[in-house]
A protein has these predicted regions:
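Amphipathic alpha-helical segments of tetratricopeptide repeats
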Residues: 25-29, 63-71, 104-111, 144-155, ...
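Residue signature of alpha-solenoid helical repeat architecture, marking inter-repeat boundaries
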Residues: 33-36, 77, 117, 157, ...
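Bacterial C-terminal helix-turn-helix
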Residues: 463-520
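Residue register of alpha-helical TPR repeats
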Residues: 37-41, 81, 121, 161, ...
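TPR-repeat structural position
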Residues: 14-15, 56, 96, 136, ...
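Structural motif corresponding to the intra-repeat A-B loop/turn of tetratricopeptide repeats
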Residues: 11, 93, 126, 133, ...
Length: 520
């Protein structure tokens, strides 16, 4: 039995492994604690539960046969088996610290464990824990080692499933070309299997990568393909809920693009096409429907990260439509869910949404201005603090951007601080595509430049007061000051600015784009 499960897992023969388990359950009804292979079977069954067979309560029930006192008498390999199974349960319960402790203990026994697959799985699960905690460097180290061990064990399909996770971590580090290549290679291997969950993960990864590049229609197509793959195994799998959440996120971004077109028509006294407004409303409705369905699935699995992410995305949709109090409620619920699991990423996202809500209240002069300003600034500061506890660069950049925007709004005399915050965010987004987060950065830069005291800046430079800025940074600062002014004087003609300053039009456009002015 155990050897068959191991081989099916190594080769990702999912239907075969599940049939094998179903037959065993018909005969026995549960794991036999007196079986000499009970610990090993429990370990491998935990991997099959992760692959889509039954629920985690099967493993929780099996662990009752291995209380702490009994584990002392186990062999080292059986002890490792039990630790692995228990770690999988901790992950399912979102207790990342305890799960990592289990997997670390297994890896500390590596000289005594001959099964390379077990060591590969321990590294793989450690990577999943690190990734969930936003510890991407450590996650990448673990998953790379997992892939190496699986390959050495001649478990190519198993290694391919691990490559999917590795590709996403590479993408997080802006190594998009490497990530896509690795994902394509894994896809080629797993297309020959019935591992529908991992095939769905591949499609979902493509969708998220294309979403990041602003190719929203292509992203939605891959998300739809992912849902089809997941549905072949389990129409209520938590990964399907994650993809529905991603779809809702992208549909909101598309709706925002449509609204910008509508607002542009209004500002230019043009009448928008009825189809445009209908498309906008339909896209918002689709986003909310997908988020509601995701919420139902996450509720079945009691998944805090997923449920909280739905709250954040739904809150942004409420914010977009001007329903500030619903948006605020969603932000607070998301924060509470994250706080229960010490989920810094979710907590930071929740505080970011709260900050945006309070900033909107300030703009619309809702509630006491001083108190709202205080709430906005505190939410922004906490979002930055929480994001710094992770290695999520985009999350930190976004938190910094909104701290900068809030500082500009609530403390007009603190533009130097806002400028420094803007530079920190820009450094984090240096190799990123020009998406909605980048657009927020341009708004911040424009506010800093517009609100700054140019005479005071030039006077400070003339006295040699430049802080810790390099000559290159000072050159860029000067370009940011002078080029927009001349652009205005020259009727916003890039060619005239280029000719007057004897610089390339490309340089002019780059500076204006950096400040969010080009094309305005």
């Amino acid at each position: 039995m155990i050897e068959g499960l191991r081989e099916d897992l190594r080769n990702r023969r999912i239907g075969s492994g599940m049939s094998r388990l179903d037959e065993h359950w018909v005969r026995c009804g549960r794991l036999d604690p007196h079986d000499e292979d009970a610990a090993g079977l429990l370990c491998y069954v935990s991997q099959w539960v992760d692959a889509g067979w039954r629920d985690i309560d099967v493993i929780q029930d099996g662990l009752c046969a291995f209380p702490k006192g009994r584990r002392v008498g186990l062999s080292i390999l059986d002890y490792a088996y039990v630790l692995m199974a228990e770690g999988v349960v901790w992950v399912a319960e979102e207790n990342i610290a305890r799960a990592l402790a289990n997997f670390d203990l297994v890896l500390s026994l590596k000289t005594e464990i001959v099964e390379r697959e077990i060591l590969a799985l321990a590294h793989f699960w450690s990577s999943r824990c690190n990734r969930k905690a936003g510890e991407y460097d450590r996650a990448l180290e673990h998953v790379s080692e997992a892939c190496r061990l699986a390959s050495e064990a001649d478990a190519g399909p198993m290694a391919a499933t691990m490559r999917v996770a590795e590709s996403w971590l590479l993408f997080q580090k802006s190594r998009t070309k490497d990530a896509l290549k690795m994902l394509s290679e894994a896809d080629a291997v797993l297309r020959e299997t019935d591992d529908f969950l991992t095939r769905g993960n591949i499609e979902s990864s493509y969708g998220r990568m294309y979403r990041r590049e602003g190719r929203y229609d292509l992203g939605l197509r891959h998300f739809s393909a992912a849902i089809d793959e997941y549905g072949k195994r389990d129409p209520e799998h938590r990964n399907l809920a994650r993809t529905l959440t991603n779809m809702g996120y992208v549909e909101r971004l598309i709706a925002l693009q449509l609204r910008k077109r509508i607002d542009s028509d209004v500002s230019q006294h043009r009448r928008s096409e009825p189809e445009l407004r209908r498309d906008y409303e339909n896209m918002r409705a689709q986003a909310l429907a997908h988020l509601d369905r995701a919420s139902e699935i996450y509720r079945l699995h009691a998944n805090h990260r997923g449920a909280g992410t739905v709250c954040v995305n739904r809150g942004h949709l409420h914010l977009d439509s001007g329903d500030l109090y619903k948006a605020d409620d969603e932000a607070r619920e998301a924060y509470a869910l994250g706080e229960q699991k010490n989920d810094y990423i979710l907590m930071a996202r929740a505080r970011l949404l709260e900050c945006m809500v309070e900033n909107t209240k300030l703009e619309e002069e809702i509630d006491d201005a001083a108190w709202v300003a205080h709430l906005a600034l505190e939410a922004a500061k906490e979002a930055v603090d929480l994001a710094r506890r992770t290695e999520n660069r985009r999350l930190l950049a976004r938190a910094l951007i909104w701290l900068g925007l809030t500082t500009c709004t609530t403390s007009p005399g603190s533009l130097d601080a806002a400028r420094e915050i803007s530079e920190q965010a820009a450094a984090l987004l240096k190799n990123e595509v020009q998406d909605h987060i980048w657009e927020d950065l341009q708004v911040l830069k424009a506010r800093v430049v517009k609100g700054g005291n140019v005479d005071a800046t030039l006077q400070a430079w003339s006295q040699g007061v430049v802080g810790d800025r390099t000559f290159q940074q000072l050159t860029e600062d000067f370009a940011d000051l002078i080029i927009p002014k001349i652009w205005e004087h020259e009727s916003r003609k890039v060619a005239r600015v280029s000719k007057r300053l004897s610089i390339s039009p490309k340089k002019v456009r780059r500076v204006l784009a950096r400040l969010g002015l080009h094309g305005a």
